[in-house]
């Protein structure tokens, strides 16, 4: 009889990728995935620590799991093994056992390949096991090949960690220094994914455009080199990458956007603020004019490229003038979509120790203003697509039985009617008929 594995994933696409790999790791040991937490023998929370709210979600979920465990005991059933993985695990370590002593295993994002051994120890009645080692090479060397197809659009982690040390960010402390996978390893995984039916691959990294992986003969590949290598794979039709840092946007990578048709005309390029003073305080290593120059060069390389970004409002010391500079940058760049957040002090980061924290109500006011502007830009872009035809990759079911959902080259969700679902996994020409803030509707173009 197989054992059941339940994984709940928080945060970024890298965590989604890691969760798939945890699933692949445990399958040979008899653990099959389930979406029903109540039948799980092992429960893994793959956590995010980028903001305080994200971290607290972990403890809230652990509280719910504790109630589930208590109910199982009353019924005479065995308790599930509880694992906290990911960036909260890396950041808080033993504190997790202090706050939630019923957790069995705490494992960081660079050491989860040891999960089979850790779980077997818990089965043998060992308790409070922790593994937070930063051994990136061992992690990638010991991860299994893909067992469960991810679908028409799949992720591959090619780079982890960050050396930039932005003063608001925990990534260097939770994911470690920048590390790039070797080229052959990435290529083999991409080949396997495409052979299982994927049409699109998203290359992942905390700072993916800093990629500097080696080949077997010690030649160093940049991200542009890696893309040129991967697009040769037969039946791979689309390639994307995220997340990028402006200072690592090389001339070669920028020009590749205009030369390689498989590289999609959409780029997530976080700037965080439009104020030079705030950018310096954040240790972003560039100013607003540098960012504008990157955007101009990208648009010269490919006129139809669409940008998205991340913004943080209320970083310590941010004034009304600084916030006005952010709004000015947003209005000048004109984004297709964006993510925006209130600054959240993270323990251990320089920003958290500053005495000029912005009051919460001011952060909220600024976020409301910024999100209104960003939403207007996103809606305007979506509405500009009405009447056009786009190639859409349909990769998932919709809410209704006769509906499927796909992605445009610009990462917009598109809904169409397809009762027999025969278009899933295919790229189809669609005429856009309606637009909303977060999605498009269309019909098959004939």
UniProtKB/Swiss-Prot annotation:
Q: Which residues cross the membrane?
A: none
Provide the cofactor note recorded for this chain's UniProt entry: Binds 2 [4Fe-4S] clusters. One cluster is coordinated with 3 cysteines and an exchangeable S-adenosyl-L-methionine.
Q: What InterPro entries does this protein's entry cite?
A: Elp3/MiaA/NifB-like_rSAM, Methylthiotransferase, Methylthiotransferase_CS, Methylthiotransferase_N, Methylthiotransferase_N_sf, MiaB_methiolase, rSAM, rSAM_horseshoe
Compartment(s) of residence: Cytoplasm
Its primary localisation, in coarse terms, equals cytoplasm
Q: Which UniProt keywords apply?
A: 4Fe-4S, Cytoplasm, Iron, Iron-sulfur, Metal-binding, S-adenosyl-L-methionine, Transferase, tRNA processing
CC terms in the record's Gene Ontology section: cytosol
**EC number of this enzyme:** 2.8.4.3
Residues that bind [4Fe-4S] cluster 2, according to the entry?
Answer: 162, 166, 169
Q: How does it assemble?
A: Monomer.
Q: Which family does it belong to?
A: Belongs to the methylthiotransferase family. MiaB subfamily.
Its name, as the record gives it, is tRNA-2-methylthio-N(6)-dimethylallyladenosine synthase
The gene coding this protein: miaB
């Amino acid at each position: 009889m197989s054992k059941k594995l339940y994984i709940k994933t928080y945060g970024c696409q890298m965590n989604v990728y890691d969760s798939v790999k945890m699933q692949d790791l445990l399958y040979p040991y008899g653990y099959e995935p389930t979406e029903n937490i109540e039948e799980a023998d092992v429960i893994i929370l793959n956590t995010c620590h980028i903001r305080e709210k994200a971290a607290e979600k972990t403890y809230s979920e652990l509280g719910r799991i504790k109630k589930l465990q208590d109910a199982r005991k009353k019924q005479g059933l065995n308790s599930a093994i509880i694992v906290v993985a990911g960036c909260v695990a890396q950041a808080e370590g033993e504190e997790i056992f202090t706050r939630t002593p019923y957790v069995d295993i705490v494992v960081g994002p660079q050491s989860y390949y040891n999960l089979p051994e850790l779980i077997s120890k818990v089965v043998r009645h060992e308790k409070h096991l922790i593994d937070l080692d930063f051994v990136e090479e061992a992690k990638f060397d010991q991860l299994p090949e893909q067992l469960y197809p991810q679908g028409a659009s799949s992720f591959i982690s090619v780079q982890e960690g960050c050396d930039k040390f932005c003063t608001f960010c925990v990534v260097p402390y939770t994911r470690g220094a920048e590390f790039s996978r070797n080229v052959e390893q990435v290529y083999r995984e991409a080949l396997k994914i495409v052979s299982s039916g994927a049409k699109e691959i998203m290359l992942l990294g905390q700072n993916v455009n800093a990629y500097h992986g080696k080949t077997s003969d010690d030649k160093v590949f940049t991200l542009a080199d890696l893309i040129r290598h991967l697009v040769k794979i037969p039946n791979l039709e689309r390639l994307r990458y995220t997340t990028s840092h402006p200072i690592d946007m090389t001339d070669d990578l920028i020009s590749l956007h205009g030369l390689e048709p498989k590289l999609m005309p959409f780029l997530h390029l976080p700037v965080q603020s439009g104020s030079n003073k705030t950018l310096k305080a954040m240790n972003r290593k560039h100013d607003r004019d540098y960012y504008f120059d990157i955007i101009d060069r990208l648009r010269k390389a490919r006129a139809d490229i669409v940008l998205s970004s991340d913004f943080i409002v209320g970083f310590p010391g941010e004034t009304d003038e600084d916030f006005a500079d952010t709004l000015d940058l947003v209005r000048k760049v004109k984004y297709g979509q964006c993510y925006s957040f209130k600054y959240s002090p993270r323990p251990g980061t320089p920003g958290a120790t500053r005495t000029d924290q912005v009051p919460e109500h001011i952060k909220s006011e600024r976020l409301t203003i910024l999100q209104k502007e960003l939403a207007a830009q996103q809606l305007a872009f979506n509405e500009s697509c009405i009447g056009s035809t786009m190639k859409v990759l349909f990769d998932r079911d919709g809410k209704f039985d006769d509906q499927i959902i796909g992605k445009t080259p610009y990462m917009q969700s598109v809904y169409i009617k397809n009762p027999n679902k025969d278009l899933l996994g295919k790229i189809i020409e669609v005429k856009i008929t309606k637009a909303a803030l977060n999605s498009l509707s269309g019909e098959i173009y004939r």
